[in-house]
Curated annotation (Swiss-Prot):
GO terms for molecular function: cyanate hydratase activity; DNA binding. It comes from the Bacteria. This is Cyanate hydratase. It comes from Prochlorococcus marinus (strain NATL1A). GO terms for biological process: cyanate metabolic process. Keywords: Lyase. The active site is at 88, 91, 114. It is an enzyme of class 4 (lyase).
Length: 147
């Protein structure tokens, strides 16, 4: 998978500064997953957020526009992912997507979970049998309307 030049530049600067997405999130007052989505061109920063980020990473203001312009979301390659970690999420949806859809619709009715009015958090859960990854998604329910 190839990434835009802006993504590569941001990731390189982050690595050179020895920062994590969590470190940058604290600086900006935003969640680490949202910050990562900004790096990958899937979110839009405010002018203030872009200025803080660019200053922290030691990058010039010529990169501000790419951070503050609304992106084409979901614009990653439309093929089945090959990265093992990302593929697991694809696999999870293949196995549990329809069951999740049915359970959500039993509880809420006919509609969807928003990915706009939405948060996602990633946590580490220590376990003697092997640490666990806990992914929590919280999206507003949007019922389909009748007309």
């Amino acid at each position: 998978m190839s990434f835009p030049e802006s993504t590569q530049l941001l990731l390189k600067a982050k690595k050179e500064k020895g920062l994590t997405f969590a470190d940058i999130g604290i600086l900006l007052g935003l969640d680490e997953v949202w910050v990562a989505s900004l790096f990958y061109g899937q979110s839009t920063a405010s002018d203030e957020e872009a200025d803080k980020l660019l200053t922290t990473l030691g990058l010039g203001t010529e990169h501000k526009e790419i951070l503050t312009t609304p992106p084409v979301k979901g614009s990653l390659d439309p093929v089945i992912p090959t990265d093992p970690l990302i593929y697991r999420f694809y696999e999870i949806m293949q196995v549990y997507g329809m069951p999740m859809k049915d359970v959500i619709q039993e509880k809420f009715g006919d509609g969807i979970m928003s990915a706009i009015d939405f948060t996602i958090n990633v946590d580490k859960v220590e376990d003697p049998k092997g640490d666990r990854v806990k992914v929590s998604m919280c999206g507003k329910f949007l019922p389909y309307k009748k007309w």
